[in-house]
């Protein structure tokens, strides 16, 4: 089903002239495997894919889409839903949730995609590159936050990723 959703996404994006997509996953079961399958399918359709090499918080995916000038983002996550669930979420070029029109087009296309239409291994048309967004994301946070004010606060500032994709992310900030 991930490959069908990725193929449908590639078909819809191709109709709009898209060339670049960011793909990431959270810490749920199968995340790396599902993200790799989506990336392979998208790349096999001629897209350049920036693939996260580990779990990524959804806001970082959204940032990366804008930062890289990508046409879309694919996040393998079920967000706030139970841990046993997973999902295929689309982001627009603006970094936010894809429009209802895009979701409807992808859903309609998924219903039409059969096994013979799935493209798997990249055939040289597209490529998969590692996503490198951490440094740029931290630079953006530095510009947006008043770090002097935060440093001057009394007490302790705590970040609890609760076992999610943000675990370990703030350690380098």
Region locations from a protein language model:
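Hydrophobic or amphipathic alpha-helical targeting/insertion segments
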Residues: 66-90, 99, 105
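Short acidic, glycine/serine/threonine-rich loops at helix termini
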Residues: 32-36, 62-65, 84-89, 168-173
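Gly/Ser/Thr-rich loops at beta-strand to alpha-helix junctions
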Residues: 26-33, 56, 81-82, 162-167
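Short acidic loop-to-helix transition motifs that present clustered carboxylates
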Residues: 53-60
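Gly/Ser/Thr-enriched, mixed-charge loops and adjacent short helices
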Residues: 1, 86-173
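An N-terminal, well-structured beta->alpha segment
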Residues: 1-40, 44-45, 71, 127-157
């Amino acid at each position: 089903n991930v490959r069908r959703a990725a193929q449908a996404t590639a078909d819809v994006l191709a109709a709009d002239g898209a060339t670049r997509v960011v793909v990431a996953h959270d810490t749920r079961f199968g995340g790396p495997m599902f993200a790799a399958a989506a990336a392979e399918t998208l790349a096999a359709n001629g897209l350049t894919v920036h693939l996260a090499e580990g779990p990524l918080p959804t806001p970082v995916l959204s940032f990366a889409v804008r930062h890289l000038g990508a046409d879309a983002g694919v996040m393998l996550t079920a967000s706030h839903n139970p841990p046993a669930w997973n999902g295929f979420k689309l982001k627009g070029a603006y970094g936010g949730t894809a429009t209802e029109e895009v979701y409807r087009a992808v859903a309609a296309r998924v219903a039409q995609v059969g096994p013979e239409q799935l493209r798997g291994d990249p055939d040289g048309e597209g490529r998969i590159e590692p996503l490198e967004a951490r440094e740029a994301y931290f630079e953006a946070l530095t510009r947006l936050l008043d770090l002097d004010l935060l440093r001057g606060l009394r007490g302790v500032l705590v970040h609890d990723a609760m076992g999610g994709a943000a675990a370990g992310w703030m350690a380098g900030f």
